[in-house]
């Protein structure tokens, strides 16, 4: 949905939705906010219920080989029983970049397990997100773009030629609930989704984000008319390195009251406690 996004021009790079209402606002690990369009989260993870094993494989590419943009998507899902299934989803997207040191690669792996019984259900999984972004700091001289025509953008000078950002994210999650119908079920009731019920549930989430930025002084633009990218080098006179990580643990117990139909006007009433 929405009206598109503004991005740096390369697949896999930083982006932001043009619709302000759709822009993410990360309370945890804000460094990853620029990659929200590429991240898999528990809310975005897919679960499947298939009659037969299902496999899907797609590969897309475009552009010249030296500036290639490509995407690889792979999915496999199958049932252990009619109500229990497991699946794996993998995505790899990226580009070699139009300008010097502009390449990007984003990868996602999602493993899922689900069981939906008449009263008990569970959805659990593991997610791995990874991004490797080369950072060139931008075009050194705007005139190379506005006043001159270059047939080969890769010869245009940039501020940084060997800087890189790396991101990694590991997520373990689980949501389970047990439903207690407020009236006796019949053999014809496949589920209690349309019956007055009370659900007791538990959700767990552990997420760890890690980011590392590196560059070198030798990889920075030089010249009499070039202002130094950094004014000072404090710890290492030839290179810089910055790393950050954050871990998030969430453990909650909740109760849902379903007065009538789950999809009705009053679907569910929620209450819970957790940390």
Go through each PLM region and give its residues.
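Transmembrane beta-strands of outer-membrane beta-barrel pores
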Residues: 59-63, 92-96, 117, 128-132, ...
């Amino acid at each position: 949905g929405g009206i598109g996004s503004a991005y740096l021009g390369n697949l896999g790079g930083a982006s932001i939705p043009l619709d302000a209402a759709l822009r993410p606002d990360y309370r945890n690990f804000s460094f990853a906010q620029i990659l929200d369009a590429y991240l898999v989260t528990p809310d975005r993870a897919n679960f499947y219920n298939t009659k037969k094993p299902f496999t899907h494989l797609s590969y897309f590419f475009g552009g010249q080989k030296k500036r290639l943009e490509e995407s690889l998507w792979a999915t496999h899902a199958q049932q252990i029983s009619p109500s229990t299934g497991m699946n794996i989803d993998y995505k790899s997207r990226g580009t070699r970049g139009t300008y010097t040191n502009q390449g990007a690669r984003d990868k996602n792996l999602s493993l899922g397990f689900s069981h939906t019984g008449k009263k008990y259900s569970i959805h659990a999984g593991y997610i791995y997100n990874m991004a490797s972004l080369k950072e060139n700091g931008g075009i050194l001289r705007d005139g190379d773009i506005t006043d001159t025509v270059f047939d080969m953008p890769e010869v245009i000078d940039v501020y940084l030629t060997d800087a890189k950002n790396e991101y990694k994210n590991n997520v373990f999650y689980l949501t389970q609930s047990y439903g207690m119908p407020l009236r006796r079920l019949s053999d014809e009731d496949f589920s209690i989704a349309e019956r007055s019920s009370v659900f007791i549930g538990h959700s767990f989430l552990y997420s760890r984000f890690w980011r590392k930025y590196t560059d070198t002084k030798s990889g920075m633009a030089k010249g009499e008319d070039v202002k130094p990218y950094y004014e000072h080098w404090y710890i290492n006179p030839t290179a810089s390195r910055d790393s950050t990580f954050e871990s998030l643990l969430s453990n909650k117990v909740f109760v849902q009251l379903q007065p009538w139909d789950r999809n009705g006007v009053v679907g569910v009433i929620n209450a819970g406690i957790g940390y």
